[in-house]
Each structure stands twice: as C-alpha cells, then as structure tokens.
C-alpha cells in the first residue's frame, strides 16, 4: 500500500513538473495545444500551419496585445490589477464581468492545461504563467499564443489558418482592419466571426485598431520585436 502511495505521489509530481520542463524546450519548435491534441484524438478536423511572428503582418500581434492584454509588456505573467478587479466583481455581484487572463496565462492553459473554469486549473495556471514569463521572451510567448489560439469554427488553430479561413490570405498579408477583426473574435471564434462580422465585432475591431496605435503599445512593440 505504501509503495502504491509513493508511486501515485511520484506520478503526480512528474505531471506537475512536466510543464515547467517543457517550457524550456518550447523556447524553440512548433508546439501544439492540449485542445488540438484532444480534437485530434476525438477525430475532429484540426488545421494549423505554424508561422513565425516575423512573417506575420505586424498589425496582427500588435492588435492582439491591444485586445487581449494591454499590459503584456509590463507584467510578469499575471496582471494583478486585473485579478483584483475580478475579485471585486465577484464580491459585488457574484460574477466576474471580465476574464482577467493575460496572454501568458492563456499560453499556459492552452499548452499544458484544460479549458473551462476551475479553481484547480487556476491554481496551476498562475505559477506556470509566471515561470513562462521568466524563461521565455515576450516575443516568443506572443508567437506561441498566435500559433495555438483557436481562430475558426471548424478546427482552425493559429493565425495562418485563421487568416486563410476568414480572408483567404496568409497572416503576412492581413491589413490592420483584418487583423483587428481576427483579434475581436478571441477567445470565442465559434460564437464570433471575422469572416462575417456582425456590428459588435466591427465595433470591437475599430476600438482595437485605435488601441494598437497608442504610444504605450508602440513602445512595447519596439522593445520586444526589434522594429
């Protein structure tokens, strides 16, 4: 019985430690998300073609940062101000009005954890996001996110597949408006559409185009992309 307990504890320790080791490996290469693997195993269609961030239209990563995580360059994996806002929402009304997850947290979840809301998942996600921010560059974190995010209703993952589905072109050819439309459907590409955007998506896109031009995000981009 004791041996069984030791084996179980060792297995649990290895499962918890594995993402921290894999993060070091994922400084290079073209990793896939747990959701992509799950869809493959379930026999669903998965379309993903990796594209380096340098080969994407610059408007896409800029606009995604503007829409998903405006403090991306200044936080260390967790936006604690946003976390406090979420906690305040829960205390005031019992439901958070905004998600609060940074791009780094979404990378942690997409690469190593599972979808859906869970206290256990969040407890694993927070230290993992801080570790990812510590060992990977901001540019690499963003590159990972842009290549593993779900970007279409039929198994399109990554910016290249998303751009091809929505606009019939590569991620390198996106206009600022098209990039903003793609950013506007995250993280719900099965509910929102960049291909046939409704008024709400169009309004969001216009907002994100303006945000991407802010001085703070322009500086963020220069410091982390070399452009």
UniProtKB/Swiss-Prot annotation:
The keyword tRNA processing is assigned to this record: no
NCBIfam families: mono_pep_trsgly
The EC number(s) this enzyme carries: 2.4.99.28
Primary location class: membrane
Pathway: Cell wall biogenesis; peptidoglycan biosynthesis
Annotated function: Peptidoglycan polymerase that catalyzes glycan chain elongation from lipid-linked precursors.
Gene that this polypeptide is encoded by: mtgA
Protein family (similarity comment): Belongs to the glycosyltransferase 51 family.
Gene Ontology MF terms: pentosyltransferase activity; peptidoglycan glycosyltransferase activity
Annotated GO biological process: cell wall organization; peptidoglycan biosynthetic process; regulation of cell shape
Gene3D superfamilies, per the entry: Biosynthetic peptidoglycan transglycosylase-like (1.10.3810.10)
Assigned keywords, A-Z: Cell inner membrane, Cell membrane, Cell shape, Cell wall biogenesis/degradation, Glycosyltransferase, Membrane, Peptidoglycan synthesis, Transferase, Transmembrane, Transmembrane helix
Membrane topology of this protein: Single-pass membrane protein
GO cellular component: peptidoglycan-based cell wall; plasma membrane
Subcellular location: Cell inner membrane
UniProt source species: Rhodopseudomonas palustris (strain HaA2)
Catalytic activity: [GlcNAc-(1->4)-Mur2Ac(oyl-L-Ala-gamma-D-Glu-L-Lys-D-Ala-D-Ala)](n)-di-trans,octa-cis-undecaprenyl diphosphate + beta-D-GlcNAc-(1->4)-Mur2Ac(oyl-L-Ala-gamma-D-Glu-L-Lys-D-Ala-D-Ala)-di-trans,octa-cis-undecaprenyl diphosphate = [GlcNAc-(1->4)-Mur2Ac(oyl-L-Ala-gamma-D-Glu-L-Lys-D-Ala-D-Ala)](n+1)-di-trans,octa-cis-undecaprenyl diphosphate + di-trans,octa-cis-undecaprenyl diphosphate + H(+)
Protein's recorded name: Biosynthetic peptidoglycan transglycosylase
